[in-house]
Amino acid sequence: MSGQADIALIGLAVMGQNLILNMDEKGFVVCAYNRTVAKVKEFLANEAKDTKVIGADSLEDMVSKLKSPRKVMLLVKAGSAVDDFIQQLVPLLSAGDVIIDGGNSEYQDTSRRCDELAKLGLLFVGSGVSGGEEGARHGPSLMPGGHEAAWPLIQPIFQAICAKADGEPCCEWVGDGGAGHFVKMVHNGIEYGDMQLICEAYHIMKSLGLSADQMADEFGKWNSAELDSFLIEITRDILKYKDGKGYLLERIRDTAGQKGTGKWTAIAALQYGVPVTLIGEAVFSRCLSALKDERVQASSVLKGPSTKAQVANLTKFLDDIKHALYCAKIVSYAQGFMLMREAARENKWRLNYGGIALMWRGGCIIRSVFLGNIKDAYTSQPELSNLLLDDFFKKAIERGQDSWREVVANAFRWGIPVPALSTALSFYDGYRTAKLPANLLQAQRDYFGAHTYELLGQEGQFHHTNWTGTGGNVSASTYQA
């Protein structure tokens, strides 16, 4: 029978299968396709048995089974695989049909695909999908962007299958071009930051001699207050987990992997000139963890401080760690939203920052109560330049900064690496400093490269000084540093 499916989904790895089952559960007829056709038959005979899901044995067969305008979602590996499928789909589709890329594609690729397909009359959507396998099955956070004309066509499906927070769907149109995938990239970068901050809190507690159960209890307490979040919750569960050999966490090799989206966020921050320092440190911390053999060798020859980790009042210091984690988390999100704001300005995206915070409230890895406070901040002040300037977050840091400073200072004294906690504190202090030592930096640049400088009160007028009396008076035009 032709024209019976509401949407087709290409790619039957776990995420693809679970999204199909989610759509089916919400009443949509889905056509499943995979490059390896045997996988389609296997899926229909097992996971999709007794559902309305139908299969296709070729792209032509798949397209013939779709209602018009046709909607095809790709959940395949980012990069050339997406372009290959698009190339094969183009001759089979008609003007007004929609192709959706639900993978972790680079936002520049999504922008390019939008431009290319617009010339052919096809609508393209690049959608971030967050929440992992469980989210895909029971309600992910969805961040669609691209050709806005596609939104009314996919909105009923996307808002039916997504997670809900306080009854509102964790899915809304993000913006043109690569906006959806850019927001998903920043989400993943913030996820890197959150995880690193939690790891540093764990490292400090472990150095103080807390047992796995004691640390789990502490994370459990934090999860019932302002740090209530998915990542804090699973950290508690991981710490408590035992198998036949005891606590599993202690036997896991301390080398962290990464798929690249955190790195993309750090690169984008450099490209847009936004100091997203915490996410950068989170990425570099994973790189450092990968140097396991070198670290083991260095640990036996490089000396640290003689001071051991100990405090007079453990209960109070554990509370200090909680406040430090919360304050640094505020900075991480402030930096992420700074990056989105600058990218939106340069790409002429109309991003709804409160809406983005709501999209992240449910279904995704960084879901937390905290995001509700961010939504409130941008709802009351849509043009807010930085979350740190919002009254709620300003007061939170005022309450917690003494604890934050105490934790970072002690970690330094004890030789415990806290790159994320400390870079967040440095950013906070830099952001609140009216006059930074960049005047000296600019003078140095002018000294060796004749790069000129502005004088206070004479902004826009550039001066060069012959610092040695032997150089010239001409400013530089090519040499940059």
Curated annotation (Swiss-Prot):
Annotated signal sequence range: none
SUPFAM superfamilies in alphabetical order: 6-phosphogluconate dehydrogenase C-terminal domain-like (SSF48179), NAD(P)-binding Rossmann-fold domains (SSF51735)
Gene Ontology MF annotations: NADP binding; phosphogluconate dehydrogenase (decarboxylating) activity
Cysteine disulfide links: none
Enzyme Commission numbers on file: 1.1.1.44
Binding site for NADP(+): 11-16, 34-36, 76-78, 104
Record PROSITE patterns: 6PGD (PS00461)
Keyword Cytoplasm: no
Entry function: Catalyzes the oxidative decarboxylation of 6-phosphogluconate to ribulose 5-phosphate and CO(2), with concomitant reduction of NADP to NADPH.
Protein family membership: Belongs to the 6-phosphogluconate dehydrogenase family.
Protein's UniProt name: 6-phosphogluconate dehydrogenase, decarboxylating
Species annotation: Drosophila melanogaster
Gene (UniProt): Pgd
